[in-house]
Amino acid sequence: MGKNVVVLGTQWGDEGKGKVVDLLTERAKYVVRYQGGHNAGHTLVINGEKTVLHLIPSGILRENVVSIIANGVVLSPEALMKEMGELEARGIPVRERMLISEACPLILAYHVAMDVAREKARGAKAIGTTGRGIGPAYEDKVARRALRVGDLFNKDTFATKLKEVVDYYNFQLVHYYQADTVDYQMVLDDILAVAYVLTGMVVDVSELLDSARKRGDLMMFEGAQGTLLDIDHGTYPYVTSSNTTAGGVATGSGLGPRYVDYVLGIVKAYSTRVGAGPFPTELFDDTGEFLCVKGNEFGATTGRRRRTGWLDAVAVRRAVQINSLSGFCLTKLDVLDGLQEVKICTAYRLPDGRVVESTPLAAENWEGIEPIYESMPGWSESTFGVKAFDKLPEAARRYIKRIEEVTGVPVDIVSTGPDRSETMILRDPFDA
């Protein structure tokens, strides 16, 4: 019997999860998003055609796969309808392939207004959120005032609850942030206009997944963002508002934790980060510019330029520890082609001179950290599109082996280009 697989990022997001999920869904029956919202940006390239998904699971392009948005996701009806419209215009029957948990909190206009107002008020100390209302929506969930998909089944009760929440937000927007208010009637009209679409896809996700498990159907859980952006384990406060780590699968989907069999960590061959926050290996020189341009390091969601740097094995080891990683998928190896030298950060030197091999938690404790590098020869030959490990340049193979050695985790998949075909699977996660 095959295994249930989690795919998640080991760094600060943007590792290339979407492509890997799309590739592996060939064997999965269910693909589940279990955290985050439309702040994610998963780019798929299939036969040269590019698709960017923000909220809908990457399995949606597969005919025989059921895509699920589970309870751990905060759902923007506006973003969902836009994404569905784009896919349906291409002939993809989204409503036949996708299901939604009734427990998903909704992201509405007042969440976006609050997100934008807060970031503006922070000024130079801004977190660097996407401004899409993710954080405020998770706040409402924890404060037990969230409006959820299931609330749409009773429109009168929904309208009453919405009025209370809009009043609460408008008071803050006006009196604390000196920002414009949100129009209650407009918010209500907008959500009720699409309520039938959302309620038409509602299912008890936990029940569905448990039944699927008993039948032996294969499941894949698609993480968004990356481990180092986890609300608990990331570089706080420069983090996202959800649990991006493997522990979020059980709470965010309702599948029992014993039924997760294999955790695949996606690790980019170098490091990137969007927005503010610690980044010890960040490069400000020509190499950093080379990685940004060649790697096309611009956010799929925001279009923002990503910061770039050498691979940080210390940070990746933290991801190994937190997620109990079974194996790695190494992505964007081809971006390193042509560099005379490649480096891996294997330890940090603290301001007091001590050398440590683990990451701090709070962002302020990262200040003054100096990366300690191992240097390795680069390679001039192209790795782009290579589909056999022994066909890679020797120096590239040594680089991969060194990553395995310093992290203690095998590289089971290597990606050498954006297309799903430009991948070598050394060990299939479903059979590992």
UniProtKB/Swiss-Prot annotation:
Enzyme Commission number(s): 6.3.4.4
Signal peptide stretch: none
Localization annotation: Cytoplasm
Pathway this chain belongs to: Purine metabolism; AMP biosynthesis via de novo pathway; AMP from IMP: step 1/2
Catalytic activity line of the entry: IMP + L-aspartate + GTP = N(6)-(1,2-dicarboxyethyl)-AMP + GDP + phosphate + 2 H(+)
Domain of life: Bacteria
Binding site for Mg(2+): D14, G41
SUPFAM superfamilies according to UniProt: P-loop containing nucleoside triphosphate hydrolases (SSF52540)
NCBIfam families: PRK01117.1, purA
Name by which UniProt lists this protein: Adenylosuccinate synthetase
Organism per entry: Sodalis glossinidius (strain morsitans)
Chain's gene name: purA
